From Swiss-Prot:
Subunit composition and interactions: Homodimer.
Cofactor: Mg(2+)
Record's cofactor remark: Binds 1 Mg(2+) ion per subunit.
Source organism of this protein record: Leuconostoc citreum (strain KM20)
GO process terms (BP): 'de novo' AMP biosynthetic process; IMP metabolic process
Binding locations of substrate: V297, V298, T299, K300, R301, P302, R303
GO molecular function, one term: GTP binding
Function: Plays an important role in the de novo pathway of purine nucleotide biosynthesis. Catalyzes the first committed step in the biosynthesis of AMP from IMP.
Entry's EC annotation: 6.3.4.4
Reaction(s) this enzyme catalyzes, per UniProt: IMP + L-aspartate + GTP = N(6)-(1,2-dicarboxyethyl)-AMP + GDP + phosphate + 2 H(+)
Protein name (record): Adenylosuccinate synthetase
Length: 427
């Protein structure tokens, strides 16, 4: 086995890209297996910062493939823009591979996403990038795949078949303008021409690599608590960020996976609507938001802030089979006198240790916290676990104990050199 999954284990924005990039230095391929350009990751390449949402994190690491799997929905315009940005810094992208089975985000997906979000009072806070409508078409079997995009004749046939129905939705349901066939065809055929050199059967490619003992990292987008099945439905994404999403979204089998690394922050954050049991609305939240620069990479919206939630994290451990834990942003908590971790909930007088499926439960939910002492020492320069203040060490140990998952790494800053391993993920 030589496959490792790195998955966000909260509501996204946990710093997965940094961890993936960190492990990618010793990998032969990095694979995105779900989501689209609705979730960004910030990655440092030397002293240059990249904010990517379409390209896999591994694109910046020389020596391994960066793979967009079949479970991803691809926005060709956004992808080509990021390719141009990376190339402008002198970084080659010959290592990019795109699944011919991945679905394409079309202009009508974006238009319908914007129209639907603007027309309802029950908004779930989408990024309006067409992700949900693209996945809807995939499940409805009226989607256009990358294999279709790179074949002008097939693309023309499908666009002629699907566009009238999409235009009827836009004009009749939402009072929006219809989209022009010729404009879409000419633009997207050119996108297909530019992307064609990178398109291949990535499932076959990855199967061959793993069979030959190559090291492959699978990179989840968003987080487990945004999973369409296991997250805070309906305030979720439209795909499966859980480890199980790798099987469908990359086309590999469970026996090919060695470890599942769950990435979390030392606290909790969330963008958009939806339940958030440990959310704070005080000076502590403001402090964490400013010190941690808690604003969405894609949306730029201020993130909601809360204490660490061990109940939600145990749910993440269960549904993704986490074997290792990477804890980021420990430095953000420096200076807080006390820290809290949610260990259980109380609902209608009964203590519960599982994460509720129904969002109506959260209206009457009380959170039970465990309080730990904080630390004042500056930890940004530490080089090992033993150099951390005792209270910081105890905080990390307590998280590991509550989740029954071994600690793989901790981070005291955003840069790669500020992440410290306690063991080798590839052992």
């Amino acid at each position: 086995m030589s496959g490792v999954i790195v998955v966000g284990s909260q509501w996204g924005d946990e710093g997965k890209g940094k961890i993936v990039d960190f492990f990618a230095e010793h990998a032969d391929a990095v694979v995105r297996y779900q989501g689209g350009n609705n979730a960004g990751h910030t990655i440092w390449h030397g002293n240059t910062k990249f904010e990517l949402s379409a390209l896999p994190s591994g694109i910046l690491t020389e020596g391994q493939l960066a793979v967009i799997g079949n479970g991803v929905v691809v926005n060709p315009e956004a992808l080509l823009a990021e390719i141009a940005e990376v190339q402008s810094q002198g970084i080659a992208i010959d290592n990019l591979r795109i699944s011919n089975r991945a679905h394409v985000i079309m202009p009508y997906h974006i238009a319908l996403d914007k129209a639907a979000e603007s027309s309802t009072n029950n908004r779930i806070g989408t990024t309006k990038k067409g992700i949900g409508p693209a996945y809807t078409d995939k499940i409805s079997r009226v989607g256009i795949r990358v294999a279709d995009l790179v074949d002008p004749d097939v693309f023309a046939k499908l666009l002629k078949e699907y566009l009238p129905f999409k235009n009827a939705q836009l004009t009749k349901l939402y009072n929006e303008e219809a989209l022009n066939y010729d404009d879409i065809y000419e633009t997207y055929v050119e996108y297909g021409r530019q992307l064609a050199p990178y398109v291949t059967d990535t499932s076959y490619l990855l199967g061959q690599m793993i069979a030959n003992k190559k090291r492959v990292v699978f990179e989840g987008a968003q987080g487990i608590m945004l999973d369409v099945d296991h997250g805070t439905y309906p305030y979720v994404t439209s795909s499966n960020p859980t480890a199980g999403g790798v099987m469908n979204g990359a086309g590999v089998g469970p026996k090919q996976i060695q470890d599942v690394v769950g990435v979390i922050k030392a606290y909790t954050s969330r963008v958009g609507e939806g339940p958030f049991p440990t959310e704070l609305h005080d000076d502590i939240a403001d402090h964490i938001r400013e010190v941690g620069h808690e604003y969405g990479v894609v949306t730029k919206r201020p993130r909601r802030i809360g204490w660490l939630d061990a109940v939600a994290l145990r749910h993440a451990v269960q549904v993704s089979g986490l074997t290792k834990l990477a804890i980021n942003s420990l430095d953000v908590l420096t200076g807080l006198k006390t820290l809290k971790i949610a260990t259980s909930y109380t609902y209608k007088g009964e203590e519960i240790h599982h994460f509720p499926a129904s969002d109506t439960w959260f209206e009457g939910l009380d959170v039970n916290f465990e309080t730990l002492p904080g630390w004042d020492e500056d930890i940004t320069g530490v080089q090992s676990f033993d150099e951390l203040p005792a209270n910081a060490q105890n905080y990390l140990k307590r998280i590991s104990d509550l989740l029954s998952v071994d600690l793989l790494s901790f981070a005291v800053g955003p840069k790669p050199e500020e992440t410290h391993l306690l063991s080798d993920v590839w052992q």
